[in-house]
Amino acid sequence: MTASASKTAQQLKYIKDSIKTIPDYPKAGILFRDVTSLLENPKAYSASIELLSEHYSESGVTKVVGTEARGFLFGAPVALALGVGFVPVRKPGKLPRETISESYELEYGTDTLEIHTDSIQPGDKVLVVDDLLATGGTIEATVKLIRRLGGEVVHAAFIINLPELGGEARLTQQGIHCYSLVSFDGH
């Protein structure tokens, strides 16, 4: 193993170890992966931004899109490191300029996301960033918004993947390449 690969492996272990697991939250049977514990640790937070930025440094990305709210915490610093613009995708009524919206299904109901109509230009190569990939519904709606504006989603990046919930498989079927720093078993 090269020195660089060894450093990366150490960083990934440190990131994973910094994420606390809360049993039975928000309901019985769920193992909640709390990314805010990573944010409380500047070494782990910095490593996560560094690794994502390095991974996409030669990707040709022209915009980074972050989903409300924790996607902002990782997407904006990655955009800054890549030297490209950051675009927030938010809940309805939170963006001041003209928007388009996309609704999506939740376990018990629906939700809606919005994006400014002038934030993505036709031909933009977009990296979508969020903290956690579970079922993929939020990212799927985000991708639809970007594509409606003429952007090309190059990749979707996450700190945490929960593969058993099927989000990565769902997004891959739609031609979206996913990259996660760490994965956890369970829900």
Swiss-Prot record:
What is one process in the GO biological process aspect for this record? purine ribonucleoside salvage
| Key words, A-Z | Cytoplasm, Glycosyltransferase, Purine salvage, Transferase
Q: Enumerate the Pfam families for this protein.
A: Pribosyltran
Asked if the record carries the keyword Glycosyltransferase, the reply is yes
Q: Where in the cell is it found?
A: Cytoplasm
User: What are the EC numbers?
Assistant: 2.4.2.7
**Does rRNA-binding count among this protein's keywords?**
no
Q: Name one GO cellular component term.
A: cytosol
Pathway linked to the protein: Purine metabolism; AMP biosynthesis via salvage pathway; AMP from adenine: step 1/1
InterPro entries from the UniProt entry: Ade_phspho_trans (IPR005764), Adenine_PRTase (IPR050120), PRibTrfase_dom (IPR000836), PRTase-like (IPR029057)
Where is it mainly found? cytoplasm
Listed CDD domains: PRTases_typeI
Give the molecular function GO annotations.
adenine phosphoribosyltransferase activity
**Highest taxon of the lineage:** Bacteria
Q: What class of enzyme is it?
A: transferase
Catalytic activity reported: AMP + diphosphate = 5-phospho-alpha-D-ribose 1-diphosphate + adenine
Annotated family? Belongs to the purine/pyrimidine phosphoribosyltransferase family.
Q: What does this protein do?
A: Catalyzes a salvage reaction resulting in the formation of AMP, that is energically less costly than de novo synthesis.
Oligomeric and partner information = Homodimer.
Tell me the protein's name.
Adenine phosphoribosyltransferase
Q: Which gene encodes it?
A: apt
